[in-house]
From Swiss-Prot:
Species this chain originates from: Marinobacter nauticus (strain ATCC 700491 / DSM 11845 / VT8) (Marinobacter aquaeolei)
GO BP, one annotated term: CTP biosynthetic process
Active site, per annotation: 117 (pros-phosphohistidine intermediate)
Oligomer and partners: Homotetramer.
Keywords: ATP-binding, Cytoplasm, Kinase, Magnesium, Metal-binding, Nucleotide metabolism, Nucleotide-binding, Phosphoprotein, Transferase
Protein name: Nucleoside diphosphate kinase
Enzyme class at the top of the EC tree: transferase
Annotated binding of ATP, by residue: 11, 59, 87, 93, 104, 114
Enzyme Commission number(s) from the entry: 2.7.4.6
Cofactor field: Mg(2+)
Gene this chain is encoded by: ndk
Transmembrane domains' residue ranges: none
Length: 142
């Protein structure tokens, strides 16, 4: 498997529950390195831009409202097969369907307030990382 980068967002519900460190610990135990990170409160414009591909979907406005409801932590994860590994750590989008021990099974409360976002493909990862981070903000850790 190739060394990859992927974008991860700890969403407002998980930040409010104060489980950032527990989620970071899971990344690190899975041999994913955090090579960039920042806490921010997304503006309406930032959230709409990030989720632009969902603009025509019925859940778009609720998603934007939720993602701007409080601070998020955005990070770039790096490692062997990072995209798939992060998706496995997160679990199913709906926490009721997520396997026990996944981030969403343990920390999410609903399909909307589902604790984390992770890139779903190499193309998405590249686009999403670039949306939040300049190259000089990413610190490769070898």
């Amino acid at each position: 498997m190739a060394n990859e980068r992927t974008l991860s967002i700890i969403k407002p519900d998980a930040v409010a529950k104060n489980v950032i460190g527990e989620i970071y610990s899971r990344f690190e135990k899975a041999d994913l390195k955090i090579v960039a990170a920042k806490m921010m409160h997304l503006t309406q414009e930032q959230a709409e831009g990030f989720y632009a591909e969902h603009k025509e979907r019925p859940f778009f406005n609720d998603l934007v409202a939720f993602m701007t409801s409080g601070p998020v932590v955005v990070q770039v994860l790096e490692g062997e097969g990072a995209i798939l590994k992060n998706r496995e750590l997160m679990g199913a989008t709906n926490p009721k369907e997520a396997e026990a021990g996944t981030i969403r099974a343990d920390f999410a409360s609903s399909i909307d307030a589902n604790a984390v976002h992770g890139s779903d493909s190499a193309a998405s990862a590249e686009r999403e990382v670039a949306y939040f981070f300049n190259d000089n903000e990413i610190c490769p850790r070898g």
